[in-house]
Amino acid sequence: MATHVLAAAAERNAALAPDAPLAPVTMERPVRTDLETSIPKPYMARGLVAPDMDHPNGTPGHVHDNLSVLQQHCAFFDQDDNGIIYPWETYSGLRQIGFNVIASLIMAIVINVALSYPTLPGWIPSPFFPIYLYNIHKAKHGSDSGTYDTEGRYLPMNFENLFSKHARTMPDRLTLGELWSMTEANREAFDIFGWIASKMEWTLLYILARDQDGFLSKEAIRRCYDGSLFEYCAKMQRGAEDKMK
């Protein structure tokens, strides 16, 4: 009887084990098993908010306007709130959050050229390279962290695992080297566009939001996902400009 009980217990433990002994990478990149202590149903994708263990209800004061989290990530750059982001709006948004003229110009061209066509409502390309927020989920690339799903929802579990897997120096922030290692770990076979896009996005975020010690904080990354980081950066830039006057 005792043998059967022990066997059943061992089977249950195996069914819930996050590690596989013959796959060392599963131990090198552990996943969190305590998420439900703070986040209800952390495995369930969120359509409107971007929660984590410290903010189970998302960003305080951030208005979602019934947009998906991926749409919110992009909405700051929709300068006239018409649901379409043109290159000059991308440029303006980048300038507002602190990038210089040359960097903003290059990034605006690259971003809109790369993302415009998948989001168009029809098959005919536009010479103005607009990005339609309504279809932004169609522009999601591979080799990413998996924090957005294919419909633009936010997955708290994948966000938290980003740090349990890759944050080696500090549990709630990443170094540039750790960011690079993360993008390498997320690479999917033959996904050249995804490899490049992922490295470019994380490098730009690091440049924008790193702290004085050279870390990219968990909170900055989370707020990037729901777009509230861009609003914050623009506010800080306006404050700095006002002090210069």
Swiss-Prot record:
InterPro entries noted in UniProt: Caleosin-related
Residues joined by cross-link Glycyl lysine isopeptide (Lys-Gly) (interchain with G-Cter in ubiquitin): 165, 235
Binding site residues for heme: 73
Entry keyword annotation includes Nucleus: no
GO MF: calcium ion binding; monooxygenase activity; plant seed peroxygenase activity
Keywords of this entry: Acetylation, Calcium, Endoplasmic reticulum, Heme, Iron, Isopeptide bond, Lipid droplet, Membrane, Metal-binding, Microsome, Oxidoreductase, Ubl conjugation
Enzyme class, UniProt record, top EC level: oxidoreductase
One Gene Ontology term from the biological process aspect of the record: seed maturation
UniProt modified residues of type N-acetylalanine: 2
Motif (Proline-knot): 121-130
Cofactor note as given: Binds 1 heme b (iron(II)-protoporphyrin IX) group.
Subcellular location: Lipid droplet; Microsome membrane
Cofactor(s), names only, from the UniProt record: heme b; Ca(2+)
EC number assigned by the record: 1.11.2.3
GO cellular component: endoplasmic reticulum; membrane; monolayer-surrounded lipid storage body
Domain EF-hand residue range list: 65-100
PANTHER family for the chain: PEROXYGENASE 1, PEROXYGENASE 3-RELATED
The protein's name: Peroxygenase
Lineage start: Eukaryota, Viridiplantae, Streptophyta, Embryophyta, Tracheophyta
